[in-house]
Amino acid sequence: MADEAVAEHPAEPAAPKAKDARAPEAPRGGARGDDNAKDAPDAPGSSDAADAEAAEREKERERAADRFKDRTRDPLAEEQGEEEPTDAAAATRARRSGQKLLASGRDLIGFDRSDVGRLHIGDINIGLDARRSGLSMRDGPVPEEELLRIRRTHIEPEGYVRLRRALEARRLLVLGGAPGTGRASTALALLEEVTRDGESGQNAERVRRADPERGVRELAAQVVAGEGGRLRGTGYLLEPALDRPGTLPPDGMDLDQLASALAERGSYAVVVVSVGSAANPLLAGRYGAICPPAPTRELVAVRLRKRLEEEHGDPVRVGGGGSARDGDGGGGLDGHADRDRDGGRDEGRARGADQGGDRPRGADQGGDRPRGGGPDEAGSLSRLLERAAELREDPEVTEAVGLDDLRPAEAELFASLLAGHLLGSVGREELLSGCRGLAAVQAYEWFAGVDRALAAPPPGDGRAPVRSGTAALFHPVAFRIALAVLGGASHSAVSAAAHLLTWELSVQSDPDSTPARPLFCDDPESDLALSRARPADGPVDVAGAEVTGRLIFYRGAALPAAVLAELWDRHFPVRAPVVRWLRLLADDPRPQVSMRAAVAAGELSVRDFEHGYAELVRPLAEAPTPRRRVFAATALDQAAGHASHRRAVRKVVEDWSRHGTPALRWTAAMALGYGRSADSMDDTLDALARIGVRDDGEQLAVASLNVVRLLTLPECATVLRRLADWTGHRGEEYQDLALVSIVRLALTDVDEVLDDEPGTPLGDRGDWPLLLALAATRPELTGKLADLFWTALNTARSRDVAFDALETLLRSASRKDGRAWTREGLAALLPALTAEEHDQRRLKWLLQRMMRDQDRPLTEERARALWRLAVPARQRRSDEEESHG
């Protein structure tokens, strides 16, 4: 039976010609007649010449088949290793993740970013100047009224009692935390509490700030000498500037000396430091402790209650915030301005200040004005608080804030915005704009004046300024930028990228010196704290497989876009090292790095297209390696996602497809495959055809790949119609473009080309061949898909690779463990593909070949099941089923 099947194998048709339906007298793809008929001799004496001619034709067919097979190769593979598969699925997932990372709040920063130091929204005027430096604070007492306010309103972070007991026991506490988390106000609260009932309890200067430039040793000397007439029992707050280049942190002996001096005088001191490599030895010692941030919900609740009390004029509450022990709280905008914005806007100790009601959200619709009007309509402070709780949980407001948790100053601003909206002074759009500004202000503070100390003039004693600490100074900044670009990637990938950027920033800052790069000074926990980041376990793509790894994200969807906007719009000198760094990331073989970086490059190009095109897109588009050209194409597509830049991107891609160098045409093809770089689907296909047929099909492989990528879009029917037109084209290059695309359609998995998330019909079939997934999910297209694949099976030069592809499809019917896989798609496609008897004979021959395969024999049971899928019951013959299933 096997020999008969081989003998009955249909003859090879010549050039294909598309038809809507199969004619009984001719194959679907059209034919020029049987090529083998030409082998018949004209006369008995011409047998030798005929044999030679037939042999030459056979060699030409083999050469054509080899050329065709070469065009079905992976165009994304490196020239040095074309046989090595590329992980297109991982690249697609990484690109999708990067787009989600930067989609939140882009182009939506609504307030004036030219003066971020002061924010004016409605009648709210709040100072948020990150350039205030702790070095401007000198020795001086903390006013009693400020201590009173701290006593009434401070919210105790988790572990506060433990911190107080440690301070009481050792007299000295080194308190570590990220800037802006309320660490300074917690220090003041601790000092206020431990000195309240001490020897200086009635002294108006019982808590003092120490000059940060003098350091721990000089503070110890002052305490011992009792300088300035300071009484026993005084509390000292010191914030040394450990992040300045060349500054050495105090050692353990310095701290012991200070603790001894404090004990002798019955005094206390809290040294506030930023977490990081410089302060870690201090925090690891016996005096060290980490200050946890105050809880966001309580911060907002206390601030909101205070604002509403002030504006509502409640006679019971205004001015009488009560004590923290009573569960009341307050706070306002009149706090002190310490270097971290911590002190004056910090936490209230009140618990349960916000008891939100369950009033229906749609009960008070107020357009652009506050819902329900002013306080007269609200009726009472409790009703205002109830409505405030509803407004705070409004999905639109939550999305506009874009931060997982708020720091003290942010909580104060957020509460002020909510209160202003409820009381009628802030409109809806102003509210949302102010909420979006929170992330922008954080980004501004992270970058403003980071390297000011490096640019300081040399000291008057003739010494050169110290620049040896550039790497330590720039690493936190580099980590934030790397996290904005690579958020969602593995922690190790982000950290490695941050070190690369640290090097580039250091070299740019001091090109005459080689930056020192410590190898054992990393502190992952400090990196997370200083960058408002969070770790999470998640999948990481490695060599085509998913493994569980430690991923890292910003604690807020709005932060990545805010960081990139701040970096590109306000800090022009940093562009050069960042561009060099992005080019390095473009060469990274891991898709989770290179594709995320490409998306970020596209977003940066949107903010300044002239610069992005000249420095990133065009140079990489002309690069010799496919990886760099894919990077450029992805960046272009990301820019095309913005309506403001879509026209420019389309003009660039159009010019490249017509007049570009081979590298530029290749890049244009990849950009076209995303479906946004031309005015319509027909224009996209025209451009891909121009690229694919030019220069004898030199770039037909990349053109066909991107035709297949377009089949995942809603305009799939338009693509199939154009493929059918190309199969009937007079030009062989157009025919080859169609045939290669058809074969590639059968060999490409859905998740290699699909941008959709799981949960869509195609997204749920990520490991299916795209041909079968379309047949299963788009039944109206099954006939067109079958006709096109039939044409590839019946064309001489494409037949071999098409049969190999069909075998791959048949083997995907079920998984190794017997569970169904693509059976649904095969059930839709095979009957349309084998409607005629000679097609069924061909399938029979292929199934028998698969059963005889010594390496991967197909079981008789599976062969029988596949035959039943393909051939309707009324057409089956019992003897055929007995022979081959």
Predicted region positions:
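P-loop NTPase Walker A phosphate-binding motif
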Residues: 183-201
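Extended amphipathic alpha-helical coiled-coil/heptad-repeat regions
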Residues: 570-777
